[in-house]
Amino acid sequence: MFRDWPYLYDAEETGEVGYMRQYAEDPRAAVVLAFDGDRVVGASTCQPMASSHPEVRDAFAARGLDASRFCYFGESLLERAHRGQGAGVAFFTEREAHARRLGLTQAAFCSVVRNPNDPRKPADYTPLDGFWRNRGYVHHPDLACRFHWREVGDDRETPHLLSFWLRTL
């Protein structure tokens, strides 16, 4: 699902397994799943920011923000056929509840920054900004980090800017 706009992420399974291991090995992390019968059709992750990626922690430290107060919301992936049926709202509700149980007072996630005129952008693409604002999140474009990944069609990883959305819980 990350192969689609705006991420255009071309993942190798070995890298994804290693990435997901950080959630599996963190007793304070959570993975929320969406099912259609017995089949997983979506997943969403979170963990205390203090346990998260150095790129995320460093962005907050550079701004004088205390990472120990934040829950970092990682991925939210949902098959296209199951969107618009409440799973996205449930992903946020469950992760926010998990953060509160951990005693965390803030939630944060980041989204990739793309040129709105990029020719690879599908004509029917609808950004999720409105959905996130309806959940109470505020965009902070000046709070950002960089992650490296290989885009679909590329042969090497390149840096990508991601900006943060925050909410007090």
Model region roles, listed by residue range:
Residues 29, 159-164:
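Short hydrophobic/aromatic beta-strand or adjacent loop that forms the aromatic wall/cage
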Residues 43-75, 119-120, 125, 143-158:
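Conserved acyl-donor/pantetheine-binding loop and adjacent beta-alpha core of acyl/acetyltransferases
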